[in-house]
Amino acid sequence: VCDILIVDNASTDGTAQWLASQPDLFCCHIDRNIGSSGGFNYGMRWAVEVEYDYVWVMDDDTLPQPDALEKLLEADRILGGHHGWLSSKCLWTDGSICPMNRQRVSPYKEISLTESDSGILPAQMASFVSLFLRREMILKYGLPICDFFIWTDDWEYTRRISRSERCYVVCSSTAVH
């Protein structure tokens, strides 16, 4: 069973009304802008409280490819659930690698991905563009830090987990950002 939880972070452009017209979405409307860090914190806490087994975190402008979740679940099965998180390969709309969302093998070294790379590669840091993790990891390592507001929350959070857990980029799972 899969649900879509949306955190509407004080939008003022008609988003709340549009979301209200979508019967298959579960929405929470926050009355003040708490930044993307706060939104991710809120949404992940919500997913943990509802007791979902898995959480797939995405930025509001992420476009996962139709098989992206299937590829993440397949990698989870291959790894036997033994991972801190899984991340999708991030592409631009033209299909090239999105440099701002490259996963890292250390705080100072990006993973050199190409558009044609496949497989499951070790990573230490990833963005919230498409991050897949089990509820137990959120319970064990906590939530993103709200004080970052908009920058670096994802790098800190994924590194916090990868210090103790093996984490990966799943190259066959792609998302456009």
Regions found by a protein language model. Name each.
Residues 52-61:
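Short beta-strand-to-loop acidic/aromatic patch adjacent to the donor-nucleotide binding site
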Residues 131, 137-142, 147-173:
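A short, conserved alpha-helix in the catalytic core of glycosyltransferases
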Residues 8-17, 32, 62:
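A conserved acidic beta->alpha catalytic loop
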Residues 16, 41, 66-77, 155:
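Short alpha-helix within the catalytic core of nucleotide-sugar-dependent glycosyltransferases
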Residues 1-6, 25-26:
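Short loop->beta transition adjacent to catalytic acidic/histidine clusters or analogous donor-positioning motifs
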